[in-house]
Amino acid sequence: MTDPELERIRRKKIMELQRKLEESQEKKVEEEREKKALEEAQRRAMLRRILTPEARERLARVRLARPQLAQAVENYLLQLAQTGQLKEKIDEDQLKRILKQVSDATRKEYRIRFKRK
């Protein structure tokens, strides 16, 4: 084989390997996206079972204003449900109490100090 022919074969092989690598990376990203979507759907279904419609609505409004708080409350509620500590659906008043508890537990305290000269 001549040098130009070897170089052409090498380039072709490199291009093929790069294409395969890109395809596998795209496939991994797509699988991860599907996995996250499935997990989120399962979370929503579980929350639908343990919250009344009014409580779900309130949690949705909280999610708009304070996403981290809503996420923490959802995790707490799902944990309670998975351990069997919930005997009935959570209504809006119970959710308010839970929101306050979680908010108080996760709230950061800020101090403002003035330096006077």
UniProtKB/Swiss-Prot annotation:
Listed transmembrane segments: none
Pfam family, one: dsDNA_bind
GO cellular component: cytosol
GO molecular function: DNA binding
UniProt entry keywords in alphabetical sequence: DNA-binding
Residues making up the signal peptide according to the UniProt record: none
Keyword Protease: no
HAMAP family to which the protein is assigned, alphabetical: dsDNA_bind (MF_00026)
Family: Belongs to the PDCD5 family.
Listed name of the protein: DNA-binding protein MK1619
